Amino acid sequence: MRKATIFLLLSLLTFAGCSINPVTGQREFVIMSTAQEIEMGKQNYAPMQQSQGGVYDVDPALTIYVQGVGQRVASQSGVSLPYEFVVLNNSVPNAWALPGGKIAINRGLLTEIESEAELAAVLGHEAVHAAARHSAKQQSRAMLMQVGVMGTAIAARDSDYGGLIVGGANVLAQAGLARYGRGAELESDYYGMQYMSKAGYDPQGAVALQETFVRLSEGRRTDWLSGLFASHPPSRERVNANVATASALPAGGLRGEREFQAAMRKTIEIKPAYEAYDEGRKALAEKNIEKALAQANQALTLFPDEAHFHALRGDIRLVEDKFDWAVTNYSRAIDRRDNFFYYHLQRGLAKKELGQADAAVVDLERSNELLPTAPAHYALGDIAKARGNLPDAIQHYKVVAKAGGEYGQAATTELVRLELPSNPGAYVNRACSADGNGNLVVSVRNESTVQVTGIQVAIQYNDASGRQQQKRFSVRGQLPPGQVASVNTGIGPYTAGSSCPAHVIAAQIAE
């Protein structure tokens, strides 16, 4: 019966989710509709750009050029999507596509390719990911796995492992869907070459591009390993497949070396400034402040109009606890580019350290408007707590707590600190059982992430004459996270499994 239930759930989803791949014409399992994909891409395009360095706006003509090449190639897909193309201010060589045709290419990848045909190959490849609904298929696979997990959890809920299966399967699902699979990459290569050929480009550009990627992957450059190769792993198989595809397509077509180099002229000229900036970021991460500042100053000397460079110097001053200098540098960054979350976030944090709470809130809220982050919400929680606005503080800390990581742990601790005195039962669970004599035993479990002390439980019960009584019992010592302590109340008789008359009425953090 349990297996039948799971099979029915999976069968219903599979039947409902079958659709025709608009690129290959094959029937595939996709639950998400095209309209949902478009909306997902629309909602996430701007936040993704923010999280990847923001728009590369120092050379608007380059963006216009890239958009033109992208639209020229995507128009050959035969799939009606609201395609958009953007260049991101990020030195990591990478490109990506969101559902619904929202595509981005990093400055760092543009500086590595050599022709318009190679650019067309990159953008055509990403256009296929969108047109062939590869992200939607991944989402559908995840949903199908979740149904299988749900069915297994239903089937195993009476076992000792019921609570473990869901979490473990979720981890496996996330790990399995971390990047496009081999089939999706080969499919995007093949149809991307069809698109670029129809658009008038030489398909040999795609062959040259993959040859370059394989060579760079063999050199194991860390920026490539963390960028394009993490999500689009190159291989000799892909090179050979591209050679075979190119041989079946019309020979010739536009290579566009001259056009590409003309469009890239300014970006190539200022590339040394970004290289100095990247070295400065690396030095700062390694806590080499002197080198970081020297590299930031070199970058600013070469190209003083880039806001990222001013923000780097602000970060250095922030690490040095020179908060007023940091504010000055972040303000210079904002003067040059006021629509990037990071500058507002960092200036808000610096102003908070200077005790300028009102000004800090303005910056932090502006940062969250552009891209909600854990540091911004955590700082806003701190400010609200200092002002005695506990509801707002709790709201911000709860947002951060869900994010996990270092900030999430700190926010969870703050939540316990704020809520434990007034709502101890939210963090300390109680359970009732009977000892061998039928007397009530109350067990308490610390569900928080911090050590707790001063736990008190109240027992409401009727005595032999039927009068309602209340007694309080204290749990001795400190209770670490996840640990259980028990108190034998001596009150009885208590029937195991009946309503638990105990309530946790007090607890505090063990400082």
Short names for language-model regions:
Residues 14-17:
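C-terminal motif of bacterial Sec signal peptides marking the signal peptidase cleavage site
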Residues 19-160, 177, 194-228, 248, ...:
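Peri-catalytic and regulatory segments of divalent metal-dependent proteins
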Residues 273, 307-308, 341-342, 374-375, ...:
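Helix-start (N-cap) detector for alpha-helical repeat units in TPR-like alpha-solenoids
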Residues 285, 319-320, 353-354, 386-387, ...:
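Register position in tetratricopeptide repeats
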Residues 299, 332-333, 366-367, 399-400:
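Canonical positions in the second alpha-helix
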Residues 302, 336, 369-370, 403:
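Structural marker of alpha-solenoid helical repeat scaffolds
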Residues 312, 346, 379, 413-414:
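Canonical tetratricopeptide repeat
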Residues 419-420, 424, 432-437, 468-472, ...:
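Terminal connector regions
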